[in-house]
Amino acid sequence: MRILFNHNISGAADLIDLMRRAQPGLHVIATHERRDTPIALAADRLLPEPAETRLMSPDAYADWLLQVALAEGAELVLPYRRREELAGFRDWFSARGIRLLTASDSNTMGFLEEKPAFLSRMEAAGVPVTPFRRFEGADEYGRLRGEGELFPDHPGPLCVKPASGIYGAGFRIIRDELPAMTPLSGLSALELPDVAFQALLGALHRPEPMMLMPFLEGPERSVDFSCHEGRLLGTVTRIKAGTSQRLLHDTYGEELARFVAQTFRLTGILNLQTIEDTAGTQRLMEVNTRASGGIGMTGLTDVNLPALFLDSIAGVRSDLPARVTGEVQAGRRELFWGV
């Protein structure tokens, strides 16, 4: 099989390695803006994705990617960049004998990436979610804080994060008061005094939708899962443990992944995240319509999520989702190579 990836996060290199572990004859073509991407180590062929493609209209970009796929003889296209838009052009690709697979249609993916809307939908369905209040800009934030105790069931510090985004960009822990004589070096990069956060909001010319939440300090789980047309194929749960992560089977994580996949009829190697509150309840934080940056760690278990996905689109699947046996603790190190 010949697969084309467009511009992607570096974790796609691990995704490709896991696919090739199951299918050694796989031929992978990747387009990317940078020559120094780790994907260059995993792909058979790396092609430039010019920066100007960012400025293309949706149909122009879809046509550009289609022409690359045709020129390279790709049978399957798995997009990351502009995937929400590309979902609307799947018929263009299928008309030329190429499968373009996205997590869902454009509207559904957009909905899933908007955390407040998604969490409200899940809460209405009975799923425990992280409590939140949505706001935009300094004035709305100030009004929220003026309401007093916003989350009485979850006392303690508050935190904020953008309503959409990846890698925790924009996440901050808000400190209403700092201990006396606290030096700047005594704060983590994620901590902000409330007065500093309000000043920062006031300095921004374009406020973005954000979420104000209780800062829950329980175990955080990242559930990587593979699914095809709403059917769950397998899961691997990762629990952060200091500088390493524990990889194992989590029954609730599997149930949640199955529910999300079925509800939105999802396809792909995707990810969801939960965090425990003080009562030990796992609360859903978000779902990602892409593979996580930590997908490579799942290769240390006996469940190969990318392989399950490739098998399923070829018509080969099990009646039950694959489950990790045992537990693995994963560390990581930097990788260097000459470009």
Which sequence ranges carry the predicted segments?
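ATP-dependent carboxylate activation and anion-phosphoryl transfer catalytic cores
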Residues: N6, A241-E255, F259-V339
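Short, charged, surface-exposed secondary-structure boundary motifs
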Residues: I39-L41, M56-D59, T108-P116, G168-A169, ...
